[in-house]
């Protein structure tokens, strides 16, 4: 059973996904069921800051052409210790063509951005095909490359909007690095390069890694 604070319960609808349960498929399923113009992605054990959605609303009123608003993300360990910030480089001079905005060239040179916590226009997300479940490890990078390649406008709001817990036990990326789905460095590099190639295609082409082929 799920319990919510007073005033929140009536605004919560639990939707059961009876299909594929990988991260990308679950997000895509969730987006398909959304009836609002915008949506956001909240991962397990992560937190929005108290000011985040107020800031999004404020920036929406000034930047009508933006289709994705990313937060500055506070990355912490499972013990709650500070690791680093993410999504903030767009506010560094000369990082991208336009201060505060993410573009394709900037992503090619600096891939470390996160999608969780962001607020997305559903139409923009759907128009480029959403997440690709066949892309392992670098599916976030591939999506952002694809969105910027197809000229979707992505802005980082210069406020701390999201706290992300890294490497939670049995989480997807924990398993990629430590668990049953562990990805070795050679495969990780292959998926990174594949993300840069697949971003030109809106559809998920069902890419698969062949370890034998890579060692020949």
Where are these regions (language model features)?
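Acidic donor-binding segment of Leloir-type glycosyltransferases
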Residues: 1-18
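Glycine-rich, basic loop-to-helix element that forms the pyrophosphate-binding segment
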Residues: 17-34
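Conserved donor NDP-sugar-binding/catalytic core segment of glycosyltransferases
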Residues: 51-87
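Short, flexible, basic/aromatic active-site loop/helix in glycosyltransferases
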Residues: 88-110
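Acidic donor-binding loop at a coil-to-helix junction in glycosyltransferase catalytic cores
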Residues: 136-143
